[in-house]
Amino acid sequence: MNFDIKWIILGIALVMYLLVIIFQEKKIWMTSVAALAVIVLGFLAQGGVLAGNVFEPLSGLAALAHHIFLELINWNILMIYVGSMIIAALFIYSRVPARIADALVTVSPSTGIAVILILAMTGIISIFVENVATVLVMAPIALALSKKLKLNPVPFMIGLALMSNLEGTATLVGDPPSMIFASYAHYSFNDFFVHQGNISIFFFIQAGMLVGCIFFYCFFRKAKEKASVDKETVISYLPLWLLLIMIGGLAVISFLTPELGYSSGCFVLGLGLLGLLWYRLSQKKSPAEVWQLVKELDWETIAFLIGIFVVVGA
């Protein structure tokens, strides 16, 4: 790669990240424009930006498209993300998380313990479910508990956000940053637990969650009242089983095929499509309702990830 081109690409990447930080609500535009700039430079440089000899068997736009769509963009990660989003949406629809939270509150000897259990559960769910969705599930429980016991809800909500964001980085399927990291560090699902014989990211994140639980317990320990909430009715446990199968399947696939191929993505996306089929047939949802669920998935992050893959790959 030409030395000057390297600096141009580095400058594009730095400006992109800076603008994403400043204008988070327009991050898709920032990454898309940066990716487009890199693609144009790649075409003009005829392989100088997009590394490798991919321009040998093909020429011009065909070679550029081949390299971008088959090498730079990590379709395995994208399929994992889409499939896990579908399963997460169905998991929330099932009301299982809310039911578990109700049970934790019921068995807690005091409000302080109940708060800690809710925060810990929020973190655990965020390990495998996108953190915004997790907070949307747990926030009503936290607000109802705060109102009933006349607690200030702000520290509780801050705790939910912190635990959710922290645990979102613990595994491959937790959050997009973990997926970007896994793509370029060549981490499999299991590598987040044990990497080259050493404990990995997951366990360090759990240490952080433990410290967070201790901190918030000190904050809420004076709340001695016995907490209670209205029990939720579970719609179905099938989404929970899909989630557990996804976790177990990813672990097995990572053990059998350490390299990041397409097997993990196809597996998770297949489970997600199976979940949609269950949602349509077993839950008797109309095509419009199924489409609404799909439409509400975080497609903006998919576009964001594609832009990141192109720019970082350059």
Where are these regions (language model features)?
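Transmembrane alpha-helix interface/packing and boundary motifs in multi-pass membrane proteins
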Residues: 18-25, 121-130, 161-173
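Membrane-helix interface "capping/anchor" motifs
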Residues: 20-30, 147-155, 282
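Hydrophobic alpha-helical transmembrane segments
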Residues: 6-11, 29-33, 78, 112-120, ...
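Transmembrane helical segments that form the transport core of multi-pass membrane transport proteins
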Residues: 118, 245-314
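Juxtamembrane and boundary regions of transmembrane helices in multi-pass small-molecule transporters
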Residues: 23, 151-154, 158, 169-173, ...
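Alpha-helical transmembrane segments
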Residues: 73-83, 164, 195-212, 260-271
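Membrane-interfacial helix-loop connectors
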Residues: 33, 37-53, 59-60, 70-71, ...
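Membrane-embedded alpha-helical segments and adjacent helix-loop junctions characteristic
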Residues: 58-154, 300, 304-314
